[in-house]
Amino acid sequence: MGAHATPAEWKGREDEFIDFNIREMFPLVAKEGLAEFADIFCEKDVFTIEQSRRYLQAAREQGFKLKIHADEIVQFGGAELAGELHCASADHLLQASDAGIRAMADAGVVATLLPLTAFSLRETFARGREMIDAGCMVAFATDLNPGSSFSASVPLLFALACIYMKLSPEEAVTAFTINSAAAIDRADRIGSIDVGKQGDLVLLQFPSYKFLPYHVGMNIVDTVIKQGEVVVKNGETKS
């Protein structure tokens, strides 16, 4: 994510910073194979709609797939831009407009929602229920970071999604698995149990996924299988 914020040395020269990324960083990153996606934080007092459009269009021309962080703080038009550019996904979206939600649904943009971030910042939760009802594919991520999301708890994420975003447990599981794989263009390889896909499984200590939202702050994982190999058994990492 080359354009999360303007570095101090570029402050007040945001357009020049965008140019620097397009002219210098994109070719270098592409040549070294360091990234598959290009991302930008389209938000008030960060990067404008036009700056974001220019950055993302240039990224696509240089072979990158597109992502965008949008409409977290204010309703800014980032969701609409995500739809316009057919981004793979748009993150945050706490303040996404009705028009933005429709634009994402029409363009097949995955709405990646971050309920633990909203919880940590005491912000309004994204409208997950309305997004699903509008035809959006909703995904979830923890957004674990020291500045705005202080938890990696999946049970807490599920509880927030079901209580405050009004998703069913089935919808929350779908969002956290196959839809999250779609957000990184990996749905053909991971995210569900299917013939030919990578063998990634989590077995819980309880008889149903429906227990996930009811055990906030608890580790309910019994077994983790990664690429067909058992890496956690009885809640303990295998050496």
PLM features per residue range, with description:
Residues 1-76:
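Metal-coordinating catalytic core of metallo-dependent amide/deamination hydrolases
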Residues 40, 44, 70, 92-93, ...:
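Generic detector of well-ordered alpha-helical packing
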